[in-house]
């Protein structure tokens, strides 16, 4: 069905995808990431602006409006989330499918964001963010029909989106944990922050959907779909590289 994440009308073009092309592209992207990521200051995928850090550290008590604003701001600047969602939406044509997949992602990252911060569940942030980078690689590879073409099977896309959503939320939770938020009004503030994230996500997705809808009307959309997802995959490898180097540098 055309509404599936890997669109049949793209597959019917029988685009020739050579494994060596994917391997070389991934290797080059990962090498560039390793070189760039050696500057540890660039490693934070969920970095918080200096001014925002000051608010998080000094705020005491419930602050619904500011936390909603900061949540929405994070979504607009969270390039890892946006890249993954672009991959998820790339071949979704029906509104019902868009709602389904976005809801699964939202459920996943909302659960781990709240559980991670409110219950203090912790993990190495570099490992979590590397998995987030992997989620971008996965979705681009899925859009290119890589699993069926090269591995002979097709993962459950809905389960994958939900699972990776858990890691995306946990990645944000690890960042907030480092800020030692005040316990006073924490539940209200985290719920407000999460609502803000969802508002920001809706606004960002509206822009993505408008751009994709316009692009799909162009004659060259299907022709350029493979290259677009190859670039998306490269972006995922770069995100992974940042975090892998960060883990190695901090472990040494």
Where are the language model's segments positioned?
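Hydrophobic alpha-helical transmembrane segments in multi-pass membrane proteins
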Residues: 73-79, 84-251
């Amino acid at each position: 069905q055309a509404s599936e994440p890997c669109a049949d009308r793209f597959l019917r073009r029988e685009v020739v995808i050579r494994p060596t092309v994917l391997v070389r592209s991934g290797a080059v992207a990962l090498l560039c990431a390793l070189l760039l990521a050696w500057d540890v200051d660039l490693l934070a995928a969920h970095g918080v602006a200096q001014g925002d850090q000051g608010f998080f550290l000094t705020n005491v008590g419930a602050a619904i409006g500011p936390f909603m604003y900061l949540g929405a701001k994070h979504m607009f600047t969270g390039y890892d989330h946006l890249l993954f969602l672009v991959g998820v939406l790339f071949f979704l044509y029906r509104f019902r499918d868009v709602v389904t997949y976005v809801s699964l992602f939202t459920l996943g990252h909302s659960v781990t964001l709240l559980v991670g911060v409110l219950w203090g569940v912790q993990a190495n942030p570099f490992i979590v963010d590397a998995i987030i980078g992997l989620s971008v690689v996965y979705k681009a590879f899925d859009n290119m029909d890589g699993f069926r073409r090269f591995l002979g099977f097709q993962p459950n896309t809905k389960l994958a989106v939900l699972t990776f959503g858990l890691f995306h939320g946990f990645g944000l939770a690890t960042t907030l944990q480092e800020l030692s938020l005040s316990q006073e009004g924490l539940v209200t503030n985290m719920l407000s922050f999460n609502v803000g994230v969802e508002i920001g996500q809706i606004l960002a997705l509206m822009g993505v959907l408008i751009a994709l809808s316009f692009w799909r009307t162009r004659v060259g959309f299907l022709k350029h779909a493979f290259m677009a997802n190859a670039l998306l995959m490269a972006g995922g490898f770069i995100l992974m590289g940042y975090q892998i180097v960060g883990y190695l540098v901090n472990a040494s």
